[in-house]
């Protein structure tokens, strides 16, 4: 009898251990840990870095949608859907109902979704942004994997003193969707970070964007800021990794508006995501950064795309309506790299940068 009880006890213990190990293995690895507090309660959620590895969407606010979209179509963005007049009945601004209507166009460059928005009625965040800063990309959106992740990240940022600016929700054939803009722009270099909870964003893009070269993939995002170190410190304090490096940049072969350039800047690089972020603090001008700052203040400056033959692409894009505005090069172990800004800023407040990097 004792041997029977002992055997059963071993089997029960083994089963319990197996269930515990299985539960541990099945736990999602991207979910931040929740440490129990002294009173046995669950601690507040932490920052989930996996969410911010990829930019899913940019919200690009403009005053003349048709003019801007037609221009970028000429440059090669053809994966475009004209959504028409869109209602946002559930929109709120800083906790107050702010129902809006806006003209909207959705486009894709690679796996990046672009929402061009021209506010018509309501939408205080969009209309105030236009009045204060002009046209431009105002928001970068990051997709969560579940409604719980969405709520947890909002709780986390709230615990760090970051409030919600805009909230919206909707229902479509894919399910219930939500978006929340966080109040990061004032200290974060004009970057409004948004969380998106929408079932269709949980899936990979079904087809690549059918755009013309070189507008087939965005290879970096860039902002003009007043103090790159303060921006770095702000995001580090929120729990993001510090910038990979901050360099005093004095490029070779500098050209600005067809004349020899003397511009210098601090460049901060954040390479923690799948697409690098560049933060530019202007030191010596004139240059396109000074132009941008005078017109828009701090904020999103350019989208970068890679090219294989710089001179050929400059000819191509000039013919499409985007001549060069600034040009510079640098040395690499495999030859000279080169970066050329195109004069697209008058059409939507965003500059397009061509990058040739032989590495």
Where are these regions (language model features)?
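Bacterial N-terminal signal peptides that target proteins for export
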Residues: 2-12
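Intrinsic disorder/low-complexity detector
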Residues: 30-54, 60, 82-92, 122-124, ...
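Core segments of cupin and vicinal oxygen chelate
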Residues: 50, 60-112, 152-176, 183, ...
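N-terminal signal peptide c-region/cleavage motif recognized by signal peptidases
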Residues: 23-25
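A structural feature that tracks compact, well-ordered secondary-structure segments
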Residues: 59, 71, 117-119, 195-198, ...
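Vicinal oxygen chelate
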Residues: 29-48, 55-63, 104-113, 115, 129-149, 151-214, 218-226, ...
């Amino acid at each position: 009898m004792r041997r029977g009880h002992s055997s059963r006890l071993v089997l029960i213990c083994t089963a319990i251990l197996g269930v515990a190990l299985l539960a541990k293995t099945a736990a999602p690895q991207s979910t931040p840990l929740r440490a129990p507090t002294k009173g046995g309660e669950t601690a507040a959620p932490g920052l989930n870095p996996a969410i911010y590895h990829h930019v899913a969407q940019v919200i690009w606010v403009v005053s003349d949608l048709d003019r801007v979209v037609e221009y970028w179509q000429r440059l090669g963005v053809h994966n475009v859907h004209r959504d028409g007049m869109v209602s946002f009945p559930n929109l709120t601004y800083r906790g107050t109902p702010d129902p809006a209507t806006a003209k909207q166009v959705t486009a894709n460059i690679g796996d990046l979704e672009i929402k061009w928005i021209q506010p018509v009625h309501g939408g205080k965040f969009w209309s105030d942004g236009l009045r204060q800063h002009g046209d431009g990309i105002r928001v970068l959106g990051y997709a969560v994997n579940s409604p719980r992740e969405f709520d947890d990240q909002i709780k986390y940022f709230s615990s760090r003193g970051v409030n919600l600016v805009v909230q919206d929700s909707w229902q479509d054939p894919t399910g219930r969707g939500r978006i929340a803009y966080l109040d990061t722009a004032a200290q974060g270099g004009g970057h409004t970070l948004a969380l998106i909870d929408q079932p269709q964003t949980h899936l990979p893009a079904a087809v690549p964007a059918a755009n013309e070269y070189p507008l087939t993939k965005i290879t970096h995002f860039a902002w003009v800021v007043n103090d790159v170190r303060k921006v770095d410190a702000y995001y580090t304090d929120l729990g993001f990794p510090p910038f990979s490096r901050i360099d005093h940049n004095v490029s070779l072969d500098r050209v600005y508006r067809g004349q020899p350039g003397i511009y210098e800047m601090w460049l901060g690089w954040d390479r923690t995501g799948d697409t690098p972020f560049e933060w530019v603090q202007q030191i010596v001008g004139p240059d396109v950064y000074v132009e941008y700052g005078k017109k828009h203040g701090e904020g999103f400056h350019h989208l970068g795309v890679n090219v294989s033959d710089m001179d050929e692409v400059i000819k191509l894009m000039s013919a499409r309506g985007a001549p060069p505005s600034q040009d510079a090069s640098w040395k690499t172990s495999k030859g000279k790299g080169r970066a050329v800004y195109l004069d697209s800023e008058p059409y939507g407040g965003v500059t397009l940068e061509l990058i040739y990097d032989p590495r």
